[in-house]
Curated annotation (Swiss-Prot):
Keywords noted in UniProt: Cytoplasm, Lipopolysaccharide biosynthesis, Nucleotidyltransferase, Transferase
Signal peptide (residue range): none
Name the UniProt record assigns to this protein: 3-deoxy-manno-octulosonate cytidylyltransferase
UniProt superkingdom: Bacteria
Subcellular localization: Cytoplasm
The enzyme's E.C. designation: 2.7.7.38
Length: 254
């Protein structure tokens, strides 16, 4: 199985300024992400950034980075530019590992790539784990996904789906036993042909209402398959508290 890992890393961040360069045990966070990705089965790991400082930080630690335009509306648009710059063929597979995931498990990267390889009818693969509890089911910040028997995604939502009519009658807030409720994990594998088409896809109503970019692909008829894993991976770094948690994890490993 051959695939490339691309790590989009945008320097601007409202909650954590200069996030890709934040120090984690002596190295920039984006470098820590690249190190984790390099432990996967990827043939190549490449950072795609909008800032020369990130590119230089990567180079200082022996990692490759490509400089992309600063005006991309999404990380997926940034990947589209990167695959063209790298000259990747349409049938190649790219795994998008976010630049704020310094604790990502290399095995998860491999599993998502393998899920796409096993589904030639699909353009995208992603990941999900069982919902932890009723609080997660009703939390709009926890994205849910429902799947067909063949692991094809049927819908992603911030709403509590699927709705267990009987268990939730009368306003109850419970996680019904056996409910096939899955917590979406935001790691993606793409076929390069899809990434090249993505910038031309118009944003649909479902994406606008849910504020979930993956719905754009589904609204345009693209198939997403979902790798199921038993438990949620470590969360990404979005806040100063998240950064301290990641630093502590690395300190404990060293």
């Amino acid at each position: 199985m051959s695939f490339t890992v691309l790590i989009p890393a945008r320097l601007a961040s409202t909650r954590l300024p200069d996030k890709p360069l934040a120090d984690i045990a002596g190295k920039p966070m984006v470098v820590r992400v690249a190190e984790r990705a390099a432990l996967s089965g990827a043939e190549r790991v490449m950072i795609a950034t909008d800032d020369a400082r990130v590119q230089q930080a990567a180079a200082d630690h022996g990692h490759a980075a490509i400089l992309t335009r600063p005006d991309h509306p999404t990380g997926t648009d940034r990947l589209s530019e990167a695959v063209d710059a790298l000259g990747l063929p349409d049938d190649a597979i790219v795994v998008n590992v976010q630049g704020d995931e310094p604790l990502i498990e290399p095995a998860l990267i491999d599993a998502v790539a393998a899920q796409l390889v096993a589904a030639p009818h699909a353009d995208i693969a992603t990941c999900a784990c069982p919902l932890a509890d009723a609080e997660a089911l009703f939390d709009p910040n926890v994205v849910k996904v429902v799947c067909a028997a063949d692991r094809r995604a049927l819908y992603f939502s911030r709403a509590p789906i699927p709705w267990a009519r009987d268990a939730l009658a009368g306003g109850a807030r419970v996680l019904a036993p056996g409910l096939p409720a899955w917590h979406h994990i935001g790691i993606y594998a793409y076929r390069v042909a899809f990434l090249r088409r993505f910038p031309a896809l118009s944003q649909g109503q479902l994406e606008r209402y849910e504020s979930l970019e993956q719905l754009r692909a589904m609204e345009h008829g693209h198939v997403i398959v979902v790798h199921h894993t038993d438990s949620a991976p470590a969360a990404g770094v979005d806040t100063p508290a998240d950064l301290e948690r990641a630093r502590a994890a690395y300190t404990n490993r060293l």
